[in-house]
């Protein structure tokens, strides 16, 4: 597993580790993968392309892993793939901008278009939204999400009234908040990574905007919601494939096993946790597909794009697990307002 142990995406690491270890324990209890026991090797990707490349290269050449599961920002994903050099498949788990992530890679996360089109249409219909503003970090995912948001707004009959992209780690939001104040949007779409999203949402509420503007956060989950200050979640929405309050499609049993296994010592199970759990099962399915536990052969199997539908079929789950759920924050929980088929 290659995860960010610190930095903006570090807040997801514990939940992802917990879910992956649970999946590995389940498979090992039932005989492993083609008779071989799963051993999880963890490494920190860091937050630069150089560190992500080095981490992946170490897993492939020194640890001799058969597969890699990763949750990284989109700007680090190519570095991980290059570091693996086709020696092991790369299962990329988070919400991302969409598209093929390259030979040897399988994607399990939902995409911006799957989230934005139905969610913004719902905002227009049910919240009478007409004016939309976009805020994001300045890297590949939000840049692509900006264009996807523009298209989704036009499809929904709304008006795009402004945008702002900020570097990682920026905490001075005065200029961006002034732009939002001047633009007077009904909805602000936020595509920021991990802790950056938490900090911006907090500043947004402190500026008094949350009473009159709706926020739609992309790639935002219960871990981030819990990190917000009291009173900072008014009119805050998020869209994910899973929320802990919206269990179903046999995820109830998974959540119960997760809770029982860790007895509250791990964060609430989130969409990122679930996708890391599924990724372990996908690696097992890839080994079954090629007939042996062999990283090169499994990576070669993924040279053409493997659709998410096909990935779910291989692990014996319905693609209904990838349904998009639009939820509104109520305290430290999300309450689902609408579910859409991805």
Label every PLM stretch briefly.
Residues 1-342:
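Extracytosolic ligand-binding ectodomains
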């Amino acid at each position: 597993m290659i995860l960010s142990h610190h930095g903006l995406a570090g807040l997801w690491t514990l939940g992802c580790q917990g879910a992956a270890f649970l999946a590995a324990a389940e498979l090992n209890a039932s005989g492993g993968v083609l008779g071989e026991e799963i051993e999880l090797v963890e490494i920190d990707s860091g937050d630069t392309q150089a560190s992500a490349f080095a981490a992946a290269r170490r897993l492939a050449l020194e640890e001799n892993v058969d597969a890699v599961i990763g949750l990284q920002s989109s700007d680090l994903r190519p570095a991980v793939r290059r570091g693996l050099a086709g020696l092991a498949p790369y299962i990329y788990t988070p919400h991302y901008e969409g598209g093929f992530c390259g030979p040897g890679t399988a994607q399990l996360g939902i995409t911006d278009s799957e989230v934005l089109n139905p969610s913004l249409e719902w905002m227009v219909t049910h919240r009478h939204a007409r004016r939309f503003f976009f805020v994001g970090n300045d890297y590949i995912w939000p840049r692509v999400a900006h264009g996807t948001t523009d298209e989704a707004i036009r499809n929904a009959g709304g008006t795009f009234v402004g945008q702002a992209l900020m570097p990682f780690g920026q905490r001075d939001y005065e200029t961006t908040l002034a732009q939002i104040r001047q633009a007077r949007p009904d909805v602000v779409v936020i595509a920021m990574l991990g802790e950056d999203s938490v900090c911006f949402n907090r500043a947004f509420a402190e500026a008094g905007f949350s009473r009159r503007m709706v926020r739609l956060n992309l790639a935002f989950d219960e871990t981030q919601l819990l990190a917000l200050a009291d009173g900072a979640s008014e009119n805050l929405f998020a869209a994910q494939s899973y929320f802990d309050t919206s269990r179903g499609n046999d995820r109830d049993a998974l959540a119960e096993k997760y809770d029982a296994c860790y007895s509250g010592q791990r964060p609430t199970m989130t969409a990122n946790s679930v996708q890391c759990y599924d990724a372990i099962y996908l690696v097992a399915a890839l080994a079954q597909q090629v007939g042996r536990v062999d990283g090169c052969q499994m990576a070669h199997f993924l040279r053409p794009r493997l659709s998410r539908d096909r990935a779910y079929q291989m692990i014996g789950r319905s693609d209904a697990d990838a349904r998009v759920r639009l939820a509104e924050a109520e305290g430290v929980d999300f309450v689902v307002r609408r579910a859409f088929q991805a």
